[in-house]
UniProtKB/Swiss-Prot annotation:
Belongs to the phosducin family. It comes from the Eukaryota. Inhibits the transcriptional activation activity of the cone-rod homeobox CRX. May participate in the regulation of visual phototransduction or in the integration of photoreceptor metabolism. It comes from Rattus norvegicus. It is found in: Cytoplasm, Cytosol; Nucleus; Cell projection, Cilium, Photoreceptor outer segment; Photoreceptor inner segment. The lineage of its organism: Eukaryota, Metazoa, Chordata, Craniata, Vertebrata. This is Phosducin. The gene is Pdc. Residues 1-70 are annotated as: Disordered.
Length: 246
């Protein structure tokens, strides 16, 4: 009997939350609460109430719908306002919603490291053939030039933090236009999107202190709006993180 009821509940709530309106969000919350509760920790009567509240009803059943609405008002209030019990469930629900939203926004290719471009042809191919939604950051450098090694190290760190951005580096002598990139303009940082150059910074190391790090480069790029929102690696493991969500 319990197995059949469980199967019925699963059929009622099959699929992911897709409601976007206020009523849809409330139904998603009720659904999440019911699914996240242990079967033995919630009375059958309350489980049935939650199931009925989260299940869509036919438009033709107006009388039944109105009766259910009146009947649910007090019972629903009790369920949703069980402070300590519902607080944890609500946090889980919010984290799940953020995770779902994050996954939907995190479409497209992912990289996670700095690509070494060996030739000018490879450089052009990277710019022209990459997806239009992808931001490409290229460091033109030479060994032994001040700031080049520090910038490459910083980009390695940023590539891990922003895997949706393609970070690349190429020696000036390998670009096929080495005469245009003398040591006094290096390192040069070029930013492309959709095959177009959207920002370029020559002698970019001059923007930083003598010793600079990934955080400095990150702040600099963010000033120009060149980086997307940072990746969320772990959604709410601590109470502090949960409170930040609220």
């Amino acid at each position: 009997m319990e197995e059949a009821a469980s199967q019925s509940l699963e059929e009622d709530f099959e699929g992911q939350a897709t409601h976007t309106g206020p009523k849809g969000v409330i139904n998603d919350w009720r659904k999440f609460k019911l699914e996240s509760e242990d079967g033995d920790s919630i009375p059958p009567s309350k489980k049935e109430i939650l199931r009925q509240m989260s299940s869509p009803q036919s438009r033709d059943d107006k009388d039944s719908k109105e009766r259910m609405s009146r009947k649910m008002s007090i019972q629903e209030y009790e369920l949703i306002h069980q402070d300590k019990e519902d607080e944890g469930c609500l946090r889980k629900y919010r984290r799940q919603c953020m995770q779902d939203m994050h996954q939907k926004l995190s479409f497209g290719p992912r990289y996670g490291f700095v690509y070494e471009l060996e030739t000018g042809e490879q450089f052009l191919e990277t710019i022209e053939k990459e997806q239009k939604v992808t931001t490409i950051v290229v460091n033109i450098y030479e060994d032994g030039v001040r700031g080049c090694d520090a910038l490459n190290s910083s980009l390695e760190c940023l590539a891990a933090e922003y895997p949706m951005v393609k970070f690349c580096k190429i020696r000036a002598s390998n670009t096929g236009a080495g005469d245009r990139f003398s040591s006094d303009v290096l390192p040069t940082l070029l930013v492309y999107k959709g095959g177009e150059l959207i920002s370029n910074f020559i002698s970019v190391a001059e923007q930083f202190a003598e010793d600079f790090f990934a955080a400095d480069v990150e702040s600099f790029l963010n000033e120009y709006g060149l980086l997307p929102e940072r990746e969320i690696h772990d959604l709410g493991q601590t109470n502090t993180e949960d409170e930040d969500i609220e």
